């Protein structure tokens, strides 16, 4: 038997919100979903009037909903923002080439300028070629590091004031779990921050969907009939995040509020003053923000170009030994060639 919408609008409920358990009609769900994101933007002071904001666009559900809602709220509440789409082409055949077509559709639907940057033009490599070198055990490390820096490079080219990413509540809860399991206190400190970066040397990133459940994002996209790309990356099944995601889904079955509980716990964490803190600086090679010298992207790229794809995987000391060994082998080879030429 149909039940009434809890918002008492007079309509029958069409869905049950995963976040609150409320039975709502579609229109009231849209209103509640959009109002929560507006509250997140305003209460966290994510933007200022007149700013130029790049919406990180992959063509997936999160970035598509983010672009749609940002445009909607910008017009409804007169934020006064100049919105553009920024997309990164990692060079994954059968995945990114198809999803970029969706991004182009978003560009046309939302009337936003679009900038696409590729790994090939930035680094001289595609993910297809990287996976052929490294295999499928550490490929997500390369992709994640290169994509983060590629977004910074794109933002700098576009001259934007901030980058809005589609990270949702599920993503952030997963990241908290991953950092706890890895003992990564440096990332655990900042992974729940709604704004990261900023300052004179970097462009800040913001997460308007920080408190939005993934299930509600999917429902919103479905009922709004938004065009998005839903195929999983062909290289993702072996990613470490997948284990955290499966664990989180199991917890959610027992306790539906676990996603928000984990985020709130992460926000309240405090660390001893003796805990090691990474020092942000500028990479001496590429000129982008880094907490190490050279930055992780430059180390990974050096490894690929040297024929040592595992150079940036693991501890820095291990990478230094690999470089020293290769330099020694090259020196011996060069010396052997000199002796050969003498005869």
Curated annotation (Swiss-Prot):
GO terms in the biological process aspect are:
protein urmylation; tRNA thio-modification; tRNA wobble position uridine thiolation; tRNA wobble uridine modification
Q: What class of enzyme is it?
A: transferase
The UniProt entry lists the main location of this chain as cytoplasm
Per its UniProt record, what CDD domains does this chain match? CTU1-like (cd01713)
How is this protein annotated for GO cellular component? cytosol; cytosolic tRNA wobble base thiouridylase complex; mitochondrion
* PROSITE patterns according to UniProt: UPF0021
**Residues annotated as signal peptide:** none
Q: Which UniProt keywords apply?
A: Cytoplasm, RNA-binding, Transferase, tRNA processing, tRNA-binding
- Quote the Gene3D superfamilies the UniProt record gives: HUPs
Q: Where in the cell is it found?
A: Cytoplasm
Instruction: Write out the GO MF terms.
Output: nucleotidyltransferase activity; tRNA binding
Q: In which pathway does it act?
A: tRNA modification; 5-methoxycarbonylmethyl-2-thiouridine-tRNA biosynthesis
The UniProt entry, under InterPro entries, shows:
CTU1-like_ATP-bd (IPR056369), CTU1_C (IPR032442), Ncs6/Tuc1/Ctu1 (IPR000541), Rossmann-like_a/b/a_fold (IPR014729), TilS/TtcA_N (IPR011063), tRNA_thiolation_TtcA_Ctu1 (IPR035107), UPF0021_CS (IPR020554)
E.C. numbers: 2.7.7.-
Query: A Pfam family in this protein?
Result: zn-ribbon_14
NCBIfam families xref list: TIGR00269 family protein
What is this protein's function per UniProt? Answer: Plays a central role in 2-thiolation of mcm(5)S(2)U at tRNA wobble positions of tRNA(Lys), tRNA(Glu) and tRNA(Gln). Directly binds tRNAs and probably acts by catalyzing adenylation of tRNAs, an intermediate required for 2-thiolation. It is unclear whether it acts as a sulfurtransferase that transfers sulfur from thiocarboxylated URM1 onto the uridine of tRNAs at wobble position.
Family named by the database record: Belongs to the TtcA family. CTU1/NCS6/ATPBD3 subfamily.
This protein is called Cytoplasmic tRNA 2-thiolation protein 1
């Amino acid at each position: 038997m149909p039940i009434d919408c809890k918002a008492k609008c007079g309509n029958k409920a069409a869905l049950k919100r995963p976040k609150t358990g409320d039975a709502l009609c579609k229109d009231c769900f849209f209103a509640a979903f959009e109002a929560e994101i507006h509250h997140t933007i305003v209460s966290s002071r994510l933007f200022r009037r007149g700013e130029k904001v790049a919406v990180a666009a992959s063509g997936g559900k999160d970035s598509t909903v983010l672009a749609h809602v940002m445009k909607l709220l910008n017009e409804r509440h007169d934020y006064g923002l100049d919105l553009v789409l920024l997309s990164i082409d990692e060079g994954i055949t059968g995945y990114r080439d198809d999803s970029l077509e969706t991004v182009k559709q978003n560009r046309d639907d939302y009337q936003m300028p679009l900038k696409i940057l590729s790994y090939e033009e930035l680094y001289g490599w595609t993910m297809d070629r990287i996976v052929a070198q490294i295999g499928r055990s550490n490929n997500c490390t390369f992709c994640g590091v290169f994509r983060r820096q590629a977004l910074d490079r794109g933002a700098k080219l576009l001259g934007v004031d901030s980058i809005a990413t589609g990270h949702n509540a599920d993503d952030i809860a997963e990241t908290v779990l991953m950092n706890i399991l890895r003992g990564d206190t440096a990332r655990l400190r900042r992974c729940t921050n709604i704004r990261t970066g900023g300052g004179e040397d970097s462009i800040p990133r913001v997460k308007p969907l920080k408190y939005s459940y993934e299930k509600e994002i999917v429902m919103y996209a479905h009922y709004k009939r938004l065009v998005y790309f839903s195929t999983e990356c062909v290289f993702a099944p072996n990613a470490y995040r997948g284990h955290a995601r499966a664990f989180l889904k199991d917890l959610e079955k027992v306790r539906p509020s676990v996603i928000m509980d984990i985020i709130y716990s992460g926000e309240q964490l405090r660390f001893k003053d003796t805990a090691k803190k990474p020092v942000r600086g500028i990479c001496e090679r590429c000129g982008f923000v880094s907490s190490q010298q050279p930055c992780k992207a430059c180390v990974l790229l050096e490894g690929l170009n040297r024929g040592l794809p595992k150079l940036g995987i693991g501890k820095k000391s291990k990478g230094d030994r690999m470089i020293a060994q290769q330099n020694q082998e090259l020196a011996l080879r060069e010396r052997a060639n000199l002796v050969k030429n003498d005869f």
